[in-house]
Amino acid sequence: MKPVYVVLAAIAGLLLIVFLGYYNLYNSAVRLQEGVNEKWGNVQSAYQRRADLVPNLVETVKGAAKNEQEILTKVTQARAGIVGINEEITNAKNPEQLEVLGKKINTAINLAYEAYPQIRSTENFQGLQVQLEGTENRINRERDLYNESVKEYNTHVRGFFASMFLNTEKFPIKEGFKAAAGAENSPNVKF
């Protein structure tokens, strides 16, 4: 084989290796950049879940608490009616009045018993706390995954060969998630 062909084959082989290296470098950068974008989308999705969920949960718990307050008020009034009947029994003059008052007591007791469902506002508040905690944990997890993805991407594009060959406009350095000023203070949920 002629030396010219050997040199040309070596140059062609070297160019092929450089091209394949650049091809791999570029595709890896694209894959990592899309991974960063996906993770940020997941963070945004978790924020949206919180924005949708928390006001609805708060209103649901408020409504249940209000309903239970109304029920307790009615039960208290029914009990007060029974106390009033007890005073009438003391003042009753004949057995017929006592029988009518006895029926009133039975009716009041039955109404109080039927109107006194199992009170669940404490369970609702605990459920709200669990939902809030779960939502905040999801958001935090998505932020962590985003930051890990940004780190992997930035490490790749700032590497020696990548920084020499990749266009910094197409593959800029990404910023990790940073908390807003005052975010170290947790938000207050008001009822």
Residue spans for each PLM region:
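A helix-centric hydrophobic-segment signal that preferentially recognizes long
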Residues: 1-191
